């Protein structure tokens, strides 16, 4: 368990806590909440806010931008404090240490009030001018989730194509790009588990739960300032996460489907081996010790797996109850 106790909601003076965030919240509930994880993005935040203001100007969409400072050490929080006087739509939350994009999105979600949420990084590789296009199909009631489809030249294109290709095959998804900006109904966030680094697979998890998904092309630009926080070392982690998500979606709700089948197969092998052993003993007049060991092993392991599947079913039921309780608590806190 991390020593981080949660998001720090502070005012300009150290030690004081604001009731909601570092910025005064608008009185009317917005239609759209833009969630912006930011780790050492002090140079990008002023331009991001300016472009966000321009993007929504004249759109008729009520909005807020929630920046989650994810343990920045470059003065990003100070910049946010300065920006709040210029942009009334800005709200800010601070993590005491880096917790990753998934946790930042979860924190932003807990403080968001819009019925549509948007994940948008602060590095300006995606321009805020595309946000109204992302949210339009959701606000009109056509779909539950919209993901961007990257356009233009960018680093790691080959790796991205392989990753997205594997994801489409594994999860049977109708979209071409999982690792881009996203907009979604807040019910999507209510329904899906967000574990570390699983934000990449929000589309897969949402689609598996029956939410409708579409994509729109969005230009990808060079980073405005700062440096990327992700390198090639993230590739093995991404592959393992992909397999973990697939396993969760396939067997998370019905663990007996996996462990029960494996247990039954091993038990069947044990029974067949036992019958073979009896036949050898009766008709050939001698025993075969390795076959006895195989019978015992198969029966024991098969029984353990089957019982493990039953225990897994009980755990799955408890997880569903906890998830529903958490959703209701989140609604009360909002």
Predicted regions and their residues:
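Acidic-residue sensor for enzyme active/binding pockets
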Residues: 41, 64, 215, 313, ...
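Intrinsically disordered, low-complexity Ser/Thr- and Pro-rich stretches
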Residues: 15-18, 22, 188-190, 212, ...
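Conserved catalytic loops of nucleotide-sugar-dependent glycosyltransferases that act on lipid-linked
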Residues: 100-105, 109-112, 125, 129, ...
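Membrane-embedded multi-pass helical conduit in multi-pass membrane proteins
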Residues: 253-334
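Surface-exposed charge patches
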Residues: 54, 78, 187, 204, ...
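Structured catalytic core of nucleotide-sugar glycosyltransferases
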Residues: 2-154, 193, 326-327, 332-334
């Amino acid at each position: 368990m991390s020593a981080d106790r949660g998001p720090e909601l502070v005012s300009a003076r150290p030690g004081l806590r604001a009731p909601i965030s570092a910025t005064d919240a608008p009185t009317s509930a917005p239609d759209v909440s833009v969630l912006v994880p930011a780790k050492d993005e002090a140079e990008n935040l002023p331009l991001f806010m300016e472009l966000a203001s321009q993007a929504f100007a004249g759109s008729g969409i009520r909005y807020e931008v929630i920046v989650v400072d994810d343990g920045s050490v470059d003065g990003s929080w100070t910049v946010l404090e300065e920006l709040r006087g210029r942009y009334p739509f800005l709200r800010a939350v601070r993590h005491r240490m880096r917790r990753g994009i998934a946790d930042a999105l979860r924190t932003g979600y807990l403080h968001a009030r819009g019925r549509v949420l948007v994940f948008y990084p602060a590095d300006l590789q995606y321009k805020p001018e595309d946000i109204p296009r992302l949210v339009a199909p959701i606000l009109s009631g056509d779909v539950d989730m919209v993901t961007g489809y990257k356009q233009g030249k960018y680093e790691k294109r080959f790796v991205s194509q392989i990753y997205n290709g594997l994801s489409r095959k594994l999860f049977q998804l109708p979209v071409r790009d999982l690792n881009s900006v996203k907009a979604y109904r807040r019910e999507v966030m209510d329904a899906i588990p967000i574990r570390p680094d699983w934000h990449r697979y929000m589309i897969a998890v949402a689609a598996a739960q029956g939410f409708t998904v579409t994509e729109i092309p969005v230009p990808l630009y060079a980073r405005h300032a700062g440096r990327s926080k992700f390198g090639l070392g993230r590739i093995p982690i991404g592959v393992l996460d992909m397999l973990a998500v697939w396993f969760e979606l396939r067997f998370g709700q019905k663990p007996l489907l996996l462990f029960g089948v494996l247990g039954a197969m091993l038990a069947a092998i044990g029974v067949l081996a036992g019958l073979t052993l009896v036949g050898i003993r009766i008709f050939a007049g001698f025993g075969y010790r390795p076959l006895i060991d195989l019978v015992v092993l198969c029966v024991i392991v098969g029984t353990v797996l089957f019982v493990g599947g039953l225990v897994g079913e009980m755990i799955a039921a408890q997880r569903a109850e906890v998830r529903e309780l958490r959703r209701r608590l989140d609604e009360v806190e909002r």
